[in-house]
Amino acid sequence: MGKITFYEDRGFQGHCYECSSDCPNLQPYFSRCNSIRVDSGCWMLYERPNYQGHQYFLRRGDYPDYQQWMGFNDSIRSCRLIPQHTGTFRMRIYERDDFRGQMSEITDDCPSLQDRFHLTEVHSLNVLEGSWVLYEMPSYRGRQYLLRPGEYRRYLDWGAMNAKVGSLRRVMDFY
């Protein structure tokens, strides 16, 4: 079970709303979000309702302002609790759509796809075990995308506007 608290003002001030499960529409509970406290679980936050828009991965900790979670603004409109995975993690990435071209398998965090695999783009992928967060830039920076087990035949399937991938991280409650 997870617990996350959203605050309208920076520094955990102002009106707050506590959540413990997926919520496709947070708009009725607060108008803006400038700080967050994650007491338990790993969460993916979304800029718009129904799990749309920019995504932000948060694990246990305090985030006193939206820059701390790499937010572009104070808009958080939906959230998803990511189920904890206790087994191994495994993903296959491909340089072309529909699982074509060079394939590389990943089983742990990768801070730079360029350094490890000489890749800057991933056009399709297959998440075999565990949930992952894909980052547009190296060192876990830039736009973020939640990847749950399943097939992603093209980058549009994970919500990206292009195939640029800089780093990948396993979703775990600790690092």
Swiss-Prot record:
Keyword vocabulary terms for this entry: Disulfide bond, Eye lens protein, Glycation, Glycoprotein, Repeat
Q: Where are the transmembrane segments?
A: none
Report the residue ranges that make up the Beta/gamma crystallin 'Greek key' domain in this protein. Answer: 2-40, 41-83, 89-129, 130-172
Molecular function via GO: structural constituent of eye lens
The processes (GO biological process) annotated in the record are: lens development in camera-type eye; visual perception
Q: Where is this region: Connecting peptide?
A: 84-88
Q: Known InterPro entries for this protein?
A: Beta/Gamma-Crystallin, Beta/gamma_crystallin, G_crystallin-like
Domain of life per record: Eukaryota
Q: Which cysteines are joined by disulfide bonds?
A: 19-23
Q: Which residues are glycosylated?
A: 3
Q: Which PANTHER family match?
A: BETA/GAMMA CRYSTALLIN, GAMMA-CRYSTALLIN B
What's this protein's function? Crystallins are the dominant structural components of the vertebrate eye lens.
The UniProt comment on domains reads: Has a two-domain beta-structure, folded into four very similar Greek key motifs.
Q: Which family does it belong to?
A: Belongs to the beta/gamma-crystallin family.
Tell me the protein's name.
Gamma-crystallin B
Q: Which organism is it from?
A: Bos taurus (Bovine)
